[in-house]
Design a protein with these regions (language model features):
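Polyanion-binding surface elements
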Residues: 1-20, 54
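A short, Lys/Arg-enriched interface patch at domain edges and termini
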Residues: 46-71
Length: 71
């Protein structure tokens, strides 16, 4: 995996759409950086892995609290 990923690449990895990735970056849940003259957004691979790890932790907390596991 390259060190910096485009938003479409992140969307493909997470199996979501690009607007959802933009929303994650905008909210600060997923750290991104603007690089280059056109200000293209990139997400560093370690930031994506950290986001995924936090998602696992939050999911575990919800399951332990009795949340249903669906689809």
């Amino acid at each position: 995996m390259p060190r910096f990923l485009t938003l479409p690449e992140v969307a493909e990895i997470l199996n979501v759409n690009v607007p959802q990735v933009r929303a994650l970056v905008r909210s600060g849940e997923l750290k991104g950086v603007q690089i280059g003259g056109r200000g293209m957004w990139r997400v560093e691979d370690v930031q994506l892995e950290a986001y995924i790890e936090r998602a696992y932790e939050e999911t575990e907390k919800r399951i332990n609290a009795g949340a249903e596991v669906e689809g």
